[in-house]
């Protein structure tokens, strides 16, 4: 008589998944926030929205992943920071619209569930939530045999925040004479990794544990540097400075992202050489013989967030960033745009 088949025979271990949920419950407790109702394990995450401090509350949401930075984490077998990247990619997108992060959910899919790897990933997600001051209220971990190679996985994140309708930062107030304040990134963040991997691993033939003198660390360490979460920076900026627009510099670089917060009637003039480039960018540019505009449209090149502010408040903003221990630079200004002008002009 043929053996009776089980879900485990098909490659899905429900008991292992349940053990992971128990571990995650402990991790989630480290991300408390007013408004969270209950814990995880239910059919949905519950959040009680207190709107008393808002005249016209608006929920702001975003979803994103980490891209092929995951491949570097897998190559290094180091998974405890990739969750920070996941939170950063979605949270930074709602921060630049003036929203205060409320809660976050994650989706993790693996070919074969590895409890320790999954727990490390969720620990990173929780750390990202703590940095962003938002609650991790739920998620999904899917074991999907036949969909991924052994050891491979994918991540997606979902952030929800709140803003007052009349305080939403949408770029509508951006105008001629405004100044571009660039706030430093920590490195690659989570974009451009397909090209970065091409340079380091294919073109140069390096390994994740190869030490590079110009970088002062191994390739893997430089590439896995977590994405900066700008929650505290943005909170202080919009409290003290009249911020007319903000852009999270991700895929597409300054070229594609800054115009998203600038009216069609305006252009941004970027002053080349006005900020400090982390070592990884000039190294890749030289090693891969990458064109300057290709660099600018692929990577953040050292600027992870741009705030558009009134010229009279520039010094105050720079002093605020310095007091927070953050690197910030005046990288350009806003000017009137002619009929045939590009949205971005480099000088």
UniProtKB/Swiss-Prot annotation:
One of its GO terms (molecular function) is phosphoribosylformylglycinamidine cyclo-ligase activity. It is found in: Cytoplasm. It comes from Desulfatibacillum aliphaticivorans. Coiled coil: none annotated. Its main location: cytoplasm. It catalyses: 2-formamido-N(1)-(5-O-phospho-beta-D-ribosyl)acetamidine + ATP = 5-amino-1-(5-phospho-beta-D-ribosyl)imidazole + ADP + phosphate + H(+). GO terms for biological process: 'de novo' IMP biosynthetic process; adenine biosynthetic process. CDD domains: PurM. Its EC number is 6.3.3.1. Pfam families: AIRS, AIRS_C. Pathway: Purine metabolism; IMP biosynthesis via de novo pathway; 5-amino-1-(5-phospho-D-ribosyl)imidazole from N(2)-formyl-N(1)-(5-phospho-D-ribosyl)glycinamide: step 2/2. NCBIfam families: purM. Belongs to the AIR synthase family. The keyword Cytoplasm applies. GO terms for cellular component: cytosol. This is Phosphoribosylformylglycinamidine cyclo-ligase. InterPro entries: PurM-like_C_dom (IPR010918), PurM-like_C_sf (IPR036676), PurM-like_N (IPR016188), PurM-like_N_sf (IPR036921), PurM_cligase (IPR004733). It is an enzyme of class 6 (ligase). Keywords: ATP-binding, Cytoplasm, Ligase, Nucleotide-binding, Purine biosynthesis. Disulfide bonds: none annotated. The lineage of its organism: Bacteria, Pseudomonadati, Thermodesulfobacteriota, Desulfobacteria, Desulfobacterales.
